[in-house]
Regions:
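Alpha-helical transmembrane segments
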Residues: 299-311, 345-346, 373-378
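Hydrophobic cores of alpha-helical transmembrane segments in multi-pass integral membrane proteins
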Residues: 30-56, 69-103, 108-132, 144-164, ...
Length: 378
């Protein structure tokens, strides 16, 4: 294990970052995860095209059992979730946390080992899912042995990240660090529930647990990881400090305490208790709090008088700029005079989404993961 000595840092956009120098951050783990994630994204994208073709030509590849819809669809879902999104999130966490802590990654060897195990997991998922070995639960299709490997890899990832944070140079933690720590803890809870607790029950109880997992896989795994990426790269790319760190923390704790309880909305008017439906309706209104907080952050951040140069700088980074514009549009937190601008931005976002053959939400999520490539040279 390489010595984890503190490195000299400076502030870029109010975010501590290492001063350029030889071998400050090796980023070997980062490259392994991000390259793998991009590769899986392209491969699974081809799987998605095959599935889409089956809706037009139902007999397309229908004589080959490995390419039937019932096997291809779980491969596409799990490939995008674990191969692309979660793999990219882990790679970006390995990039962001050491820089926010002012130290090197606690163990580059452990990180590389985690990456190797993660690739073994993805390849095992391809073989088992195409072979018809699956549990038949949404987002939890992976056979139990493969799911156990996911747990082991996540423990390795969590140990490395938390050990890096424990040796940090700065006492106060930036909001991205909070979101990434939350992602690690929430993922452990959510994944164990969806992949193991569901096997201990049947019927309505199993369905309720499964949709709790499915719902929170989006809200407590990919959402906080995406927010961590945005809170890090947007201020850094624009070289402008975050508008209000306390506001971002309000969004963090709102997500932590509210989102987990609303998973049953997938079963509204279904065979679940009425009190559960009533309570989740009450809590669901607060799910918007993190988004509104983030949107207000970006709006205030973007409207500062000193931000004209930073806006031009952001405009030169397409994916960061689209992330800012998308957050404005989706949060609905823009001031009334900016409605005309928001409409133009919405049209731009919609045209980009149509060009990519998907919806704006997924486009935003993918752009957030690609931002590292465009902002690394800023």
């Amino acid at each position: 294990m390489a010595p984890n000595t503190a490195v000299e840092v400076q502030s870029v956009g109010g975010i501590p970052t290492a001063v350029a120098g030889p071998d400050v951050h090796r980023d070997i783990t980062v490259k392994w995860f991000l390259l793998g994630a991009v590769g899986y994204f392209l491969i699974v994208g081809i799987v998605a095209l095959i599935i889409a073709a089956k809706f037009v030509w139902p007999d397309f590849l229908g004589s080959i059992q490995y390419f039937t819809y019932g096997r291809m669809r779980p491969l596409h879902v799990n490939g995008m979730l674990f191969g692309w999104l979660l793999g990219a999130d882990m790679g970006l966490a390995y990039y962001i946390v050491p820089r926010l802590c002012g130290v090197r990654l606690w163990s580059e060897k452990l990180g590389v080992a985690t990456s190797i195990l993660w690739n073994i997991i993805i390849l095992s998922a391809v073989v088992t899912l195409l072979g018809g070995y699956q549990k038949g639960l949404e987002y939890a299709d992976l056979p139990t042995p493969v799911a156990i490997l996911v747990v082991i890899a996540w423990v390795m990832f969590g140990v490395n990240i938390f050990a890096t944070i424990a040796t940090r140079k700065y006492k106060q933690m930036y909001v991205s660090t909070w979101y990434l720590m939350g992602t690690i803890l929430w993922t452990a809870f959510v994944y164990l529930t969806g992949n193991f607790a569901t096997l201990l029950t049947t019927g309505v109880n199993q369905a309720n647990l499964n949709w709790m997992y499915t719902h929170n896989a989006v809200g407590l795994i990919f959402t906080p990881a995406g927010l961590a990426v945005g809170y890090y790269f947007i201020p850094r790319a624009s070289n402008t400090p975050l508008y209000n760190h306390k506001l971002s923390m309000i969004g963090f704790w709102s997500l932590a305490f509210v989102y987990v309880w609303t998973g049953a909305h997938h079963m509204l008017h279904g065979p679940i208790s009425q009190w559960l439906q009533t309570n989740l309706d009450r809590l669901f209104g607060h799910v918007a709090d993190p988004g509104l907080g983030g949107g207000l952050q970006l709006h205030r951040h973007h409207e500062r008088p000193v931000a004209s140069v930073q806006r031009q700088r952001l405009a030169q980074v397409p994916d960061v700029g689209n992330g800012v514009l998308s957050a404005h549009v989706l949060s609905g937190s823009d001031a009334q005079p900016a409605l005309g601008e928001r409409d133009r931005l919405q049209d731009r976002l919609d045209s980009r989404a149509r060009a990519h053959g998907g919806d704006g939400h997924l486009l935003i999520h993918c752009h957030g993961r690609r931002v590292l490539c465009d902002s690394a040279n800023l």
